[in-house]
């Protein structure tokens, strides 16, 4: 049985594929998650995160951008965008506690991104979580 951490990792992979131009990923997300042994409650959790991010992607990007300071959102790598979008979605639109979300995103950054990415993710998501003190937004 997959853990929530594994489910989040699979969601980041789906978001990465979507950001890279694979529009078909929406249609096959469920089967891809099942191939990764994400089933039952974790499958429902992963699909709710994936679909939630896609449904609110413009709003999520608008939440992230003010916290980037000297960075241009469009110039971020696809993996960094995927992790930030997942983290921002969970911070803004789910009841999961912010420290848990930020820690999970840092760990995903260690797994999937460049060596300096976890510090970057921590700074952005921490700043965002402090701004969004009332949860959830939806």
From Swiss-Prot:
Cellular component aspect of the GO annotation? cytosol
Q: Which SUPFAM superfamilies match?
A: NusB-like
Query: Keywords assigned by UniProt?
Result: RNA-binding, Transcription, Transcription antitermination, Transcription regulation
Short name of one Pfam family: NusB
Q: What are the BP-aspect GO terms?
A: DNA-templated transcription termination; transcription antitermination
Could you tell me the superkingdom of the organism this chain comes from?
Answer: Bacteria
Q: Which GO terms describe its molecular function?
A: RNA binding
List the HAMAP family hit by this protein, alphabetically.
NusB (MF_00073)
What does the UniProt function comment say about this protein?
Involved in transcription antitermination. Required for transcription of ribosomal RNA (rRNA) genes. Binds specifically to the boxA antiterminator sequence of the ribosomal RNA (rrn) operons.
According to its UniProt record, which protein family does this protein belong to? Belongs to the NusB family.
| Name under which the protein is recorded | Transcription antitermination protein NusB
Q: Give the source species.
A: Helicobacter pylori (strain ATCC 700392 / 26695) (Campylobacter pylori)
Tell me the lineage of the source organism.
Bacteria, Pseudomonadati, Campylobacterota, Epsilonproteobacteria, Campylobacterales
């Amino acid at each position: 049985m997959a853990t929530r951490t594994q489910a989040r990792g699979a969601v980041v992979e789906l978001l990465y594929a979507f950001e890279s131009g694979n529009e078909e990923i929406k249609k096959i997300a469920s089967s891809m998650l099942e191939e990764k042994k994400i089933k039952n409650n974790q499958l429902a959790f992963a699909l709710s995160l994936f679909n939630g991010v896609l449904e609110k992607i413009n709003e999520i990007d608008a939440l992230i951008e003010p916290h980037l300071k000297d960075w241009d959102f469009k110039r971020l790598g696809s993996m960094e965008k995927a992790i930030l979008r997942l983290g921002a979605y969970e911070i803004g639109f789910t009841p999961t506690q912010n420290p848990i979300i930020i820690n999970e995103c840092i760990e995903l950054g260690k797994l999937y991104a460049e060596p300096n990415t976890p510090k970057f993710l921590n700074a952005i998501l921490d700043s965002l979580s402090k701004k969004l003190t009332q949860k959830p937004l939806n």
